[in-house]
Amino acid sequence: MAARSAPSCHLRLEWVYGYRGHQCRNNLYYTAAKEIVYFVAGVGVVYSPREHRQKFFRGHSDDIISLALHPERVLVATGQVGKEPYICVWDSYTVQTVSVLKDVHTHGIACLAFDLDGQRLVSVGLDSKNAVCVWDWKRGRMLSMAPGHTDRIFDISWDLYQPNKLVSCGVKHIKFWSLCGNALTPKRGVFGKTGDLQTILCLACARDELTYSGALNGDIYVWKGINLIRTIQGAHTAGIFSMNSCEEGFATGGRDGCIRLWDLTFKPITVIDLRETEQGYKGLSVRSVCWRGDHILVGTQDSEIFEIVVHERNKPFLIMQGHCEGELWALAVHPTKPLAVTGSDDRSVRIWSLVDHALIARCNMEEPIRCAAVNVDGIHLALGMKDGSFTVLRVRDMTEVVHIKDRKEAIHELKYSPDGAYLAVGCNDSSVDIYGVAQRYKKVGECVGSLSFITHLDWSSDSRYLQTNDGSGKRLLYKMPGGKEVTSKEEIKGMHWASWTCVAGLEVNGIWPKYSDINDINSVDGNYVGQVLVTADDYGVVKLFRYPCLRKGAKFRKYIGHSAHVTNVRWSHDYQWVISIGGADHSVFQWKFIPERKLKDALHIAPQESLAESNSDESDSDLSDVPELDSEIEQETQLTYHRQVYKEDLPQLKEQCKEKQKSATSKRRERTPGTSIRLHFIHGYRGYDCRSNLFYTQIGEIVYHVAAVGVIYNRQQNTQRFYLGHDDDILCLAIHPLKDYVATGQVGRDPSIHVWDTETIKPLSILKGYHQYGICAVDFSADGKRLASVGIDDSHTIVLWDWKKGEKLSVTRGSKDKIFVVKMNPYVPDKLITAGIKHMKFWRRAGGGLIGKKGYVGTLGKNDTMMCAVYGWTEEMAFSGTSTGDVCIWRDVFLVKTVKAHDGPVFSMHALEKGFVTGGKDGMVALWDDSFERCLKTYAIKRADLAPGSKGLLLEDNPSIRAISLGHGHILVGTKNGEILEVDKSGPITLLVQGHMEGEVWGLATHPYLPICATVSDDKTLRIWDLSPSHCMLAVRKLKKGGRCCCFSPDGKALAVGLNDGSFLMANADTLEDLVSFHHRKDIISDIRFSPGSGKYLAVASHDSFVDIYNVTSSKRVGVCKGATSYITHIDWDSRGKLLQVNTGAKEQLFFEAPRGKRQTIPSVEVEKISWATWTSVLGLCCEGIWPVIGEVTEVTASCLTSDKMVLATGDDLGFVKLFRYPAKGKFGKFKKYVAHSTHVTNVRWTYDDSMLVTLGGADMSLMVWTNEVESHREKKYCDSEESDIDSEEDGGYDSDVTRENEISYTIRALSTNIRPMFGVKPHLQQKEPSVDERQGVVRGSRPPVSRAPPQPEKLQSNNVGKKKRPIEDLVLELAFGYRGRDCRNNVHYLNDGDDIIYHTASIGILHNVATGTQSFYQEHNDDILCLTVNQHPKFINIVATGQVGDSADMSATAPSVHIWDAVNKQTLSILRCSHSKGVCSVSFSATGKLLLSVGLDPEHTVTIWRWQEGAKIASRGGHNQRIFVAEFRPDSDTQFVSVGIKHVKFWTLAGRALLSKKGLLSSLEDARMQTMLAVAFGANNLTFTGTISGDVCVWKDHILCRVVARAHNGPVFAMYTTLRDGLIVTGGKERPSKEGGAVKLWDQELRRCRAFRLETGQVTDCVRSVCRGKGKILVGTRNSEIIEVGEKNAACNILVNGHVDGPIWGLATHPSRDFFLSAAEDGTVRLWDIADKKMLNKVNLGHAARTVCYSPEGDMVAIGMKNGEFIILLVSSLKIWGKKRDRRCAIHDIRFSPDSRYLAVGSSENSVDFYDLTLGPTLNRISYCKDIPSFVIQMDFSADSRHLQVSSGCYKRHVYEVPSGKHLVDHAAIDRITWATWTSILGDEVMGIWSRHAEKADVTCACVSHSGISLVTGDDFGMVKLYDFPCPEKFAKHKRFLGHSPHVTNIRFTSGDRHVVSAGGDDCSLFVWKCVHMPH
């Protein structure tokens, strides 16, 4: 028997030879204790050079590849590779885990770094995006994450001198990051001309924004900010792998084998060339360097660690060596000394001293070494090579004895015979050669039986036999030395083996798992003395088994540390140690063997010894000596709780089915029924698969659960209250230490835990996101702040929560076996225990993870299954109850004793003040003293002891006890049979509540005239229940078989019951005694019915597809109804008792005539006319509407019609009880729905007077009683929810503005494309025309300084001659004319008591001073702002949040985000990147100002709540499938908010981290319909007001509509504002101005009275988009981009801001001498703006869209070109039309006066330019035009002498024409000599440099050269304004860029004197005025 249990001895890791130098850098440091920390394989090593001792950190599961040291130098962070890699932060002193960071990275963790104070840790992943992640490591929480780079990142560091800044570097890049909120934003380092773009390998940050970095070519690059400022060339001659900074300066180490020390300013101090030292060698490469004081640590590529003392730097000290890169396979031990020999593919053979832990000899061979052996006398060492040769060396001086090559393939194994005479050599070519040692290794034999390569060899003790294993897993035996194969069984029996290293053979059967045929065990070695066997496998595991182990699947102890395959393992000669070697990690592990007798002492000496690793999970999957599992527990472990369809899947399923319904719902459907039901009482308690789920609350009520309901039972009044927040089975329940809150966990795909208040029955927090399938155990901590939960997924995940915040603190995989219970340590909140199938585990928290140890049973017992557990009186005492009836007592992790407590499992135990109480399967309750020494008292649960006041009857004596709890002088007991009992201390037992036992319940019947009902179940009982207030079970009877249906006779005296074996019986309804029984069918009887009236006939339906009709009086079968093709599900009689209606499983609705059973066909129209005695059918036209949209996945199982035939109740497979109006014609009827049952509802019945509805849950075994509440109009009781499966088909209303806003698609700046339909080759890709110089063959720069040729004329006429020309070096935004009102709302607010207003346009936030008109800007957004809100809390004064558009959801810089900033100083306080796509359309601060709500534009319209100061996302959930316009917090709340949108209003609550929502309920008002809602405001007492598309305002109380303010406005109500100080409400709508109405209204707090304000804008319709109220003023933003201030007293309007209504603004012209400019736009207006006065001076409505505008040279005339081809000339003085003309049919793109004012040039999209002579007067006759323009005209410029015109066209070509003839000029020399009056062309060699590399899809759209002729500004499709020098003929010229506009800058101009630049926006309809900053003289 013992052979299959794990051995009781133990291995302890003592030493690791090696250091990981390959593929890793910067992984070697000094700790504060002057120890050295590094890693190798999967082990972190702390080495003390003083004591020559190693400590090990073994918390990783795979190769460690990165390491960082905390600034205090005690803590270490390490990162590993793997599919789900994690980071451990651990203490280098205790080598215990402090925190585990996981669930974010994939592939591996490449770099780690702590910040200055060590609070945060940054990590970089190995995934394709090289994700960068910042952690709050103590809490195990991720703060921020962003894609790092498209290529590998090699190093990352925090800037230790600037907070929240990091630097990362890698392949061909360096990035400078800033962290703000949850946003990590990178800026790429600019290499510029200073150095080549190349790979940066390491970096260090210094003061003054300096960063030093080491490059691949050996240079050091020095950065200031993001720019490269200098390089230190040749710092190393090859790549610099490591850079370390310390107080004295910097140390660098490189591939050239040198260490360089630098001072703090990076001036060189010294060089140490390790290759030149005595330990050095050619090719030495430094991977890691650490400089501390006078010591330097160096790690090399070849796994050495050197320590250098600075003043003796030529004498480095070698403190660690290991094998270099290359697989390590060869291992042998010396036969007499404590030495081990290893040989590797690095071609070295090394000898290690196991005592001194040191390398004592090394020899390099010619070939890679694959195996080794030492002869018995220890003199010869044989090495087998990869090339098929073998070499023999003398051990003492490593000289060669012989080298033999007989084979061509690798030698895998060789062994000397025990007598030393022979050497056996096994090869890859399947042969074994035998050599004679004495004959100088002459070949004496050969074994050729194998068909595959040889893997292992062993000699027999007498050296006469050899056994081999080969690659196919075969074991063969040979006679020695000849090599004849041995097959005789007799001969084999007698062999004794000198060693056992074979993996195949009887003795080692047990090392293989039971059902596997894989060969992943690489090596074994038997220890005959200790009777143990050690194995090495491909998964990095070393295992100990008993030896011999004969039976497959033996138990073992396992040890991890190696990363991948362990290639070989051997005992040392005296069995003191085990040596194991790793193939890929090329490390050598030395383990100390601790025999059984020393185990106890050993455990106490070594604290870092974690037993969890040794006594592994797999090693005890099925110990043979564990007793059989108890039947009850076995049944329970087989429950899966999987669902075909989870409730979470319903929304998606509905979406998928949406298509089918479109057609179905065109008909107007019935409203929901007028009645509602309310859950009244539940008969049932879930005891059969749950434990300890029954408690007393603070006030003595009893809390438990059944189905999906949390029940609070009041035993005085016999009433129940219900928590109905769950939507599926509750599996566990725990009570808060104060006994007022309860936590319940449910089944689900992503199951949730609800923490709720037993008094108010409101949820306090909902926890989800970390479990799967369900939650089987929960427990509160002693302080009540934390909660532990266990899931039922395969690894039984354990999660620790801060439940109030809803935050996960830690998570870990619990165990492969089922966990039954979790308990938190009442004394140490970071500790907990879990217990379950064959295990007890003790856990402690470590950051985001938990570290577990298995309970250590020792010799006291065996690993039993634990059913319950509690903590005792000190933190290390724990008690657990087992499946065999014992109680185990634990101290720390050790079992100290067991006490027999019950017969059969102990299911529940509870700690009391002075002792314990236990309950078991034997039906006994036992009270114990405080040390479990003696049992004080036992109570048996027996029928005899039932007290008279019991509410029901005990089914049997001694039911299995599943839950037990004490309080109020009583013991509360819950049984497996579904009973809840109260045991008085003196003995009497009161039964309080009961239900059916395990087994489905289907049969239900209500009595014809009494409030009682009968149920029958698969639990083989028939029960009668009292539905009157006594709520008890009146009678019960056991049946021989389970039953599925029952029915009372019409007189109520008899009860018919159908059983599952095809029989049925009739019983006396009072005594339940048999009257008569029949057995005519084989299958289940599914329905049974007495005919109405006298009850003469009984119809019995079965799954045999027949209905039998019996005559009751004669007890004879009189008819059979045949013809059904499937089993019968429901039957009903008509009221005459003549006709039967039948439903079948094939969805047939059939009719039969009684009593003979003849089938009738009845047209569906007629069916309605028939009067039915009962209706329980689910088929037919009358109930078509009860089938849901997702009918494929769910069946309607039951229905029942009220006697007044008004309301049909149904039950379905998803546990919903629904009420429909009858008849429910038309598909997908509207209904009221109730969730309480968990899975299928099997039956529903109204009582005889319709006062109650009784429903049965199939699998939840509960009988629920609901009261019918017919609503009166005064008293509105609302139901759980009122819905239909699809959105109401009624139209939500129509309005053009709403439709536009809903359908708008926002362009992302980065994805912007051409605004003009350009075609052709871009200028920077065209073949360049040669210049004059080039044509003349002049080499550039070689033209003589003095030349006879006339000087080239100026390109541009300079207008400000006389002044020195000063180039412009910067542009500063000074004014923005524009406001985004067209598709945003509530985005204008007062600040500073109404002195300033804040609003936005394009991507800038604008603070505008009301008195002076001055503006300041927030310019940190990188794309359009869509929403803005102001924090109202006095603590957060002037704090603004703005949300922007974005594309991706990968959290990179282009993701949608919210910025929170200070409006006064424009400081960004936080950036919140959203993980959804498209953009953020609404933001709102909570009452305390600490939370922010944001709504996304993604298809789900995600609603997210943030703690904005930390950048933490608290909760997030899809809001609605259609557009949400606004969501706002209630002004007095941090948890309630309301969202409104297209046909949508939802009332939300934040509970912990979960968002719960309720739809607005309309049914309370007769003809209310769900309209599109546009705005929201709030009143006291939970009142909410929503503005609708029709102009009504809806008033809601909680979530129920209570009144409608009809026509509050005549058009949509777009904006509402709640004034906090007085509660008054402002509304803004869209309406035509009228006498009494107005687009803005001010209302009282209840929205009963109002005052209207008219906006005197002169518009036909005013459309208000934003309202805000200050002191005596109302601030209004309109659709027409005006911001108006209205006085409350005098109603006077003051327009503060004007802007164009619609864009693009194509036309822009600046006045020739004054600071004025004109703009012309698609909205049909031309506007005149004054820069000095900061306002619009005038506007002209043209009635058509305008495209271009131009001043005459004197500034007295204006020419305007229209979109329809017309152009107009106005006189500036009077704005009168001087002339107009329309010679073209399509848009005029540019219009220009010639500099001499004589000609007007008009360029159009008809590929033409027309010339008009203005001297001929206002008739405007065309004098000529330019032909042959290949595409539409974009821009035109006149020459200074008015004789030429340059034209840019839509095919990227520039042409020059003569004026006025229109002749095309092609002579390049002539063109080069023209001086231009203006330059606005985007084409031409002079502006080649403005075209950027990144313009595949987007273009430069406009340009303008300054009047001084030396600066150039451009605008482009990306919305950027760029400043260049002019001319800029070089491609990709240097420039400065200025953001602010939305995509498409349409025009740009300098004002006179180059004082300002004006830019016009396309998408944003805004005009920006930039101040020019000139370079000083």
UniProtKB/Swiss-Prot annotation:
Biased composition (Acidic residues): 615-629, 1281-1294
Chief location of this protein within or outside the cell: cytoplasm
Subcellular location: Cytoplasm, Cytoskeleton
Example of a GO cellular component annotation carried by this entry: microtubule
Gene3D superfamilies (alphabetical): YVTN repeat-like/Quinoprotein amine dehydrogenase (2.130.10.10)
Pfam families linked: Beta-prop_EML, Beta-prop_EML_2, HELP
Name by which UniProt lists this protein: Echinoderm microtubule-associated protein-like 5
Lineage, broadest ranks: Eukaryota, Metazoa, Chordata, Craniata, Vertebrata
Gene giving rise to this polypeptide: Eml5
